[in-house]
Amino acid sequence: MDGRSAEEEERYKWKQSDAFIGAVEGFLVQLEDRLIDFKDIEYKNMKKSAEELLTLYFYKFTEIPMLNRMEAVMEYCVDEYETLCGKSLREDELEIISEKFLSMYESRDIYEIYNWFLEEQGFDTLPEVPLAERYLQYEDVYPVLYLKYRLCQNRQHRDIRHLVIDEMQDYSYLQYVILKELFPCKMTILGDRAQSIDSKEQDVLRFLPKLLGKKGLRVIELKDSYRTTLEIATYAQQITGVEGIHYLERHGKAVEEIRTDKMQAFEQILEKVHLGTDGYEDGYETAAILTMTEKEALEAYAFLKERREDVHYIDRDTSAFKKGITVTTYYLAKGLEFDQVFVLGGDKDHAFYKQYLYICATRALHELGVFVVN
């Protein structure tokens, strides 16, 4: 999210889209002809020609994913042989036969097969490195998972009767496809469209009816907002332009927008923090400084931590939330709420700026200050 170029952003969005799924499905059709080099199989009195194996693979076991299909062909041939011979093969014999069948695959490596797909699409391929040194960029995690799901036998979680998905706006089309395949059950999907961390608001309601089926689909829009003061709620509404929301008539301080330089912003935030632990009878329990990037958050944390003990930094590995002053990025603050929120910095020309400002604003319960840093 920090520092993603326009080209990387477009590539990421494509890899999460229905267009990507269409490209993968087309690739899989061609892959069937490329993936296996059929050869005659002979072990003792068990003999199968390449033509017989091809027929079994393409016509008898078509419902089985490609990387598991040759095992099904082998089991069929072994069962036939054992029936004719009237005895079972030993484990060591089955291992030899299995190796003969599986060696017909040009590759069974999902990583390598995904590289074939990337090459076909004109993208840079993943590094050809030993297994222990492999890693995936975030943009490739779900595409690889989808490809693996299509190529390998996967267990559906039929023991799950009802799936609840929160923050629905942060899931891509591809992720919903994977969830639908893994959990063939009823779902409750919750979220706020305006809080999308995509550069453009993603209205999942445009594609969910098609993906999940319109039958039995019920959409409920909640129009009442109780969490923030009317001043903060109105400020957030002006960012998104969403209308028709009823806000609770709870008034508080006006939202402050302050244009200043970075160091003055740090100093003013320290002055404005109003916690009960500072001796204020009406003091708050929590305050937060939210930034657009991790670099900005770390810089703010370093400055504030030197001046106050109760400053805490939240990163991806944080497991516990503490009272006091929290410093983190806006995307890690999703789902959290604070009595006071200070929005620090951010590039107004950045593709994520509107979502950044809205998410930060909706984290505040009582006071909101927005520092536009020169």
Describe these PLM feature segments.
Residues 1, 122-128, 149-162, 169-374:
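Conserved helicase motor core of SF1/SF2 NTP-dependent helicases
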Residues 1-163, 170-178:
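Alpha-helical nucleic-acid-binding subdomain
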